[in-house]
Amino acid sequence: MSEELITITVDGQQYDAPKGAMLIEVTDKAGIKIPRFCYHKKLSVSANCRMCLVDVEKAPKPMPACATPVMDGMVVHTLSQKAIDAQKSTMEFLLINHPLDCPICDQGGECELQDVAMGYGGDVSQYSDTKRVVFDKNIGPLIATEFTRCIHCTRCVRFGDEIAGMRELGGIGRGDTMEIGTYIQKSVASEMSGNVIDICPVGALTAKPSQYEARAWEMTQYPSIAPHDSVGSNIFIHTLRDKVIRVAPRDNEAINEVWISDRDRFSYEGMYSDDRVTQPLVKQNGEWVETEWQSAFETTHAALNKIIKANGAESVASMISATSTLEELYLLQKMMRGIGSNNIDHRLRQVDFSDQSSAPVMPWLGMNIKDLEKINSVLLVGNNIRKEQPIIAHRIRKAVQHHDANVSFVNPADYNFNFKVKTGLITDISAMTEELAALAKAATAKSGQSVASHLATLVNAATVTSDHESIVAALSSDKADKSVVMLGNVAVNHPQFALIRSLSNEIARHTESQLAYTPEFSNSAGAWLAGAVPHRQAGGEVVASSGLNASQMLDGNVKAFINFNIEPERDCSDSAAALSAMKTADFVVVMTAFVTDAMKKYADVILPIATFAETSGTYVNMEGFWQGARGCVSPLGNARPGWKVLRVLANQFDLDGFNQVSSDDVMQEMKTFCSDIQLDNNAVADSVADYSNQSGVMRVGDTPIYAGDMLVRRAAALQQTDDANVACVRINSKQADVLKLKDVEKVCVKQNDNTTVMALVIDENIADNNISIPAGLIETAGLGGAYGAITVEKI
C-alpha cells in the first residue's frame, strides 16, 4: 500500500512529502540543511536543543523542524530573518557554559557544535557572567567524559533507553543544575556503549583508549569489516603514521545500520599487545631463536616432510580460527589436501560431529539481517544472543519494540536479554533436549503431522506444559508469518548438538518457521565454503575419505600440528586435551600474530602473521554476504599476511596451484567453487547418535564476549570491563545449599584429573544442576571440556 503524499513549500520550492513525516526528515531528503543537535535519525524526537527552529507561515513563533509534522500546503522558510535570529539566539544560549576548549578537545575538527557555531552562531557573546563547571565521572575504561562541554541534547540518554536497552545515562537535576551522569557511580556496562561516542555532538563523550592520540584531520580513514562476530559490521579504521588509532562505524542499513559493538570498536588495541610476535622464531636445543623467513620455511618443511614419510600425511592436522580471512581458510585447506591430509577444521569448540555429513553447505541466518526487524516470533535455542551477536540482538529488540514480537528461549541460564521475553525455559544443560522434545511434541500436535521417525521415541515420551504450548502457539500463530527458531553458540557446542539440531528443525518445520544459525565468528560461514572442514572441500564438495574433526585431533594420535591464528588452550572445546595434544605431538608450527608462554612450550616454529587491519581479505557473514577489506597499516616488524605465508609454505612442498600474487587472485579462484551453492538450513540427518543425558552437576562453559579470539583477549580497555571480569564459579542458591557451599567465597573445581581454585558467586540466573565456569580464559584453560561433569568443593 503506497503512502499518502502531500505538498509543502520550503524556501520557495515545492516538495512531495509523506503525510505525518517530520519536517526535518523532508528537508534532509531534499538536501536542505537545517542545524540540529538533539535530533538523530535513529533516535526518538526530544526537541530539547531548539537548534532546528524554522519559520513556518501562520505559526506565531519559530517551530522545531524535528518535531513539526508536515501538513498539506505548509510553507516553511529556513533562511528568513526570523529563522536565522532564532537559530543564532539558541546557539548563543548553548555556548554560555561551554568551555570553548576546541584546541585540546578530541572532537575538534569533527564536532557538530563547531560546525554549527561557525555557520549559525554570532561572533560576539552577550554573556559575561561566570561559566559553570561540571565534574567528570568515571563511567568505565571505554568512554572518556568531559561533561562541562555537554549541551544536554540527551542523545546518549535516548541511545541507552532505545537502542542498547540499558538506560545507564540520565539527566539529573533541572535548569542550570542539570547534569548527565549514571546517578549511582558505576561503569557503563552495555556491549554497545561506545556508540554514544559517535552520536555525541560535542566532545563530552569521547573514546578513552585513543584520547589525545591524534587530531581528526591528521588521520586517514579506511573502510573495513569487523573481524569478530558473523554480522560483518562495516567499520572505518582511522590511522596515523602507520598505526591504527581508532575504529568507528560505517553506515550500512542492511547490516549494522550506524552502530557497532564495543568488541568491534575497541579490539584494535590488541594489535599492539606486548606479546605480539614480529619475527619468525625457531626452537633450537630448547631455546627460541629469531631467524629469517626462508630458514623458518625450510625448517617447517623438513620437519613436516619427515613426519609424513614416517607416519603418512594423515598424521598431520591443522586447526584454524574462523576469524581468519576467506583467503587464509581456503589456502590452508588446499595446502593440507595437497600434501594428502583431510585433517583440517575450524569448529574448535564443537564436540558433536555425528551428523556433519548432512549439515548445510554453510550454517546461515536463513534471511537477510535487516529482515529480523520484521519477525513476529523467535525461539532462541542455546543462544546468548545479546553477548554473542550484539547487532542481531539489537535487530530483535527493534522487532519487539515496533510490533511486539514474541521472544522465547530454551537456555541453561537466564541471560538477561535487553528485550522483553514472553516465555523462557531455563533448564540444566543436559535436559535441553528434553525441553526441545516437548516443544516438538507440542508442534506436531498443533500441525497434525507426525514427527521424524528417528525422534519419535524421545518426542513421544516428552511431557508438554503450558509454556511449551504457548511457545509453539506464538511460532505458528497466523500473525507469526515470519517466525524463527534460532540456534546459538551454546546449542552448536553442546555435546548433543546433532539431536538439538534435529529437534529444532522439527519445531521449525511443524510451525512453518525458519531454522536459523548465528555462526560464532566473522568467517564461521565462510570457513564451510572454503572447505576448512575434514569432510568437504571448497564449495561443499564431499571428500572421498573424511579426515579428523577438531575433537578427534586432540586424542593424542596426531604427530604434527599446523595451527593458524589460534591458542588451543583457550580456543578448543577441551582445553586440557588441547594442551596435552600439542605437547605430545612431534612437531607444532604456529602461524600467529601473538606468542604466549604456553605456545613457547609446545611449539617448534612460530611464524608471525598480520592481523585483520594489516592484511586484505574477505569475510562471509551470517546472511551469506561476501565483503572484502583491505589492509590499512603495515604488518608489525617482519610479520606477513597469512595468505602469503601459506602460499610460500605450499611452494616448499612443490604443490601446484599456489602461484597467486594477490589476495584477489585467491578469492577469484575460490569463487569458481561457490557459483552454484544453494543454502538450506533444513537439511538434517535421518538418524542421530543414541541420546542419553548425563546425570549430576554439569559445567556450562560459555565463552565470554571478550574472550572469543586472540585479538579481543589482548584489547586492554575491553579487558577492564565488567564483561571481562568473569573468572569465577556461578551457581544458584539452591545448588549452593545442595553442595554445602553457602557463604563460601572460594571453591576447588575438579574436572577429570584437573583442579583449580576460583571465587564463588551466587547467581540466581543459573539453572539447577548447572555450574557456570567460563571457557576461553587463562584461569580455566587447564580444566577440560566446556560442557561436562564437574565437581565443586569447599576449600
List where the protein language model places each region.
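A glycine-rich, hydrophobic/aromatic-adjacent loop/helix-cap motif
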Residues: D478-D555
